[in-house]
Amino acid sequence: MTNIRKSHPLMKIINDALVDLPAPSNISSWWNFGSLLGICLILQILTGLFLAMHYTPDTLTAFSSVTHICRDVNYGWAIRYMHANGASIFFICLFIHVGRGLYYGSYTFLETWNIGVILLLTTMATAFMGYVLPWGQMSFWGATVITNLLSAIPYIGTDLVEWIWGGFSVDKATLTRFFAFHFILPFIIMALAAVHLLFLHETGSNNPTGIPSNADKIPFHPYYTIKDILGVLLLMTMLLTLTLFAPDLLGDPDNYTPANPLSTPPHIKPEWYFLFAYAILRSIPNKLGGVLALVLSILILALIPMLHTSKQRSLMFRPLSQCLFWALIADLLTLTWIGGQPVEHPYIIIGQLASILYFLLILVLMPVAGIIENKLLKW
């Protein structure tokens, strides 16, 4: 008789994804982050669910309901800070996962890559709306500033902003709808992640060399299940260390002040994982131009497969492109730092140069490096 895990309709799906999946024998730890993202998502949904049981999406009580969770609910403080810092860990994993895809040329799996870009955008939207919910100063002003950017859209901009706000300013209607969206989106992310995985399993995983690995595949279990468990242990260690020793390390002190529409905080800035995009937005003096640059800074990922000029898939054997890749990482770190600084000299010019370099590296320098490397190989 066939093993139940291979014959049962539901077990078969899990078996083909986690047990008998043929995986390349040489994938490194950079391939761990997909499973870590899955763990992050489950963790965020669970902690979020328990938070939603005690949270009230109302301008008068939202702030105090979060305080109540931290003070009066059993282990509420742990759930709240695991959820807040879980988002940071989620984005660290996301950025590494995308970076891995860029470095090793995984973007040639078009469907998988494009769904990944949609997943990134959806996760960013979810995180933004979640940041508004505690209804502190940075929540309120962050929501005001970011939603206001839509008013730069010609003709329909102002109507669009008022439609999203549900009034003429960020108020009760805005908070209620943001809570509704923040609750539903993670489940949409889960469905998209399943499709992401479905398309990946159509082609099989890429590997560090970028060379087809059909000649040398190994079963996912036990080799990569045990490797993933190690990754999860390290991830949980990081998350718990952050939550228990420095829960407010990545947060903004302004968010411990209840939202006040009459007093603007000195420096409005988003959470650290949006700072790179925020720096690009601020580096352009024109409102519409800034919004376009902000959107393009993420959507440019969808163009990457079209900008691939090299005859090799991975950067493993391409030192010139490797240098440019690490320059891009350094540039993104610079943008992240600039996004958290006030708008004054010398930060303005540094931000503008870093923004230009970001687009220049992706759109011009890396494709040109690919062509040069092709020539060098022929020569």
Curated annotation (Swiss-Prot):
List where the protein spans the membrane: 33-53, 77-98, 113-133, 178-198, 226-246, 288-308, 320-340, 347-367
What InterPro entries does this protein's entry cite? Cyt_b/b6_C (IPR005798), Cyt_b/b6_C_sf (IPR036150), Cyt_b/b6_N (IPR005797), Cytb/b6-like_sf (IPR027387), Cytochrome_b (IPR030689), Cytochrome_b_C_euk/bac (IPR048260), Cytochrome_b_N_euk/bac (IPR048259), Di-haem_cyt_TM (IPR016174)
Q: Does the keyword Glycoprotein apply?
A: no
Keywords (A to Z) from UniProt:
Electron transport, Heme, Iron, Membrane, Metal-binding, Mitochondrion, Mitochondrion inner membrane, Respiratory chain, Transmembrane, Transmembrane helix, Transport, Ubiquinone
Give the residues the record marks as binding heme b b566. 97, 196
User: Which residues does the annotation say bind heme b b562?
Assistant: 83, 182
Q: Which GO terms describe its molecular function?
A: metal ion binding; ubiquinol-cytochrome-c reductase activity
Q: Name one Pfam family in it.
A: Cytochrome_B
Where, subcellularly, is it found?
Mitochondrion inner membrane
Question: Gene3D superfamilies, per this entry?
Answer: Cytochrome Bc1 Complex, Chain C
Q: What intrachain disulfides are recorded?
A: none
- What is the membrane topology listed in the Swiss-Prot or TrEMBL record? Multi-pass membrane protein
What is written in the cofactor note of this entry?
Binds 2 heme b groups non-covalently.
Subunit details: The cytochrome bc1 complex contains 11 subunits: 3 respiratory subunits (MT-CYB, CYC1 and UQCRFS1), 2 core proteins (UQCRC1 and UQCRC2) and 6 low-molecular weight proteins (UQCRH/QCR6, UQCRB/QCR7, UQCRQ/QCR8, UQCR10/QCR9, UQCR11/QCR10 and a cleavage product of UQCRFS1). This cytochrome bc1 complex then forms a dimer.
What the record says about family reads: Belongs to the cytochrome b family.
Misc remark for this entry? Heme 1 (or BL or b562) is low-potential and absorbs at about 562 nm, and heme 2 (or BH or b566) is high-potential and absorbs at about 566 nm.
Q: What is this protein called?
A: Cytochrome b
Q: Which source organism does the UniProt entry give?
A: Hexaprotodon liberiensis (Pygmy hippopotamus)
Q: What is the lineage of its organism?
A: Eukaryota, Metazoa, Chordata, Craniata, Vertebrata
